[in-house]
Amino acid sequence: MPKTSYAWHELTLTLSTNTDPTSAQFALTNAANSVYEKYRKEIDHQHAVLERVMDTAFPKPQPGTKWQFTDAGLELVLRYPVVIEHAEEIDDQMTREVMRVVATNSQLKASLSGTPKLRAAIRA
C-alpha cells in the first residue's frame, strides 16, 4: 500500500499438549507487547495514513496470538506488525524477549518442544 511500510511477521513456538494455554498466551503476549511498544507510534502513524488514503477505518495493528494443532504438538503463533526498514532489528528484539520469557518461566520452558520459528506472515 502506498505511504505505508509495515508488514506482519510471526514467531511460532511448539508446546506440549499439557501446556496451560492461558498462562503461556498471557506471558508471550506481554513479551510481544513490551517490544511492540518501542515502535508502536511509527506503526500507528502509518496506519493513520492508510486510513486517510483509503477513507476507511481499520482496526489498529497490534500483536496477537492464536493456537493451532500440528503433528508436532500445540503451536502458538505470535503475530506482530513490523516496520519494514527495521524488520530484522524488530525480529531480533522479539525473539530475544520471547526467549527471555521462556527461560524465566519454568512451566513454559519445560513445555517447549522444538525450535521456535520466525517467518513473514503472508495471507491470501
Regions found by a protein language model. Give the residues of each.
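Solvent-exposed, non-transmembrane regulatory segments of membrane-associated proteins
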Residues: T19, T29-A124
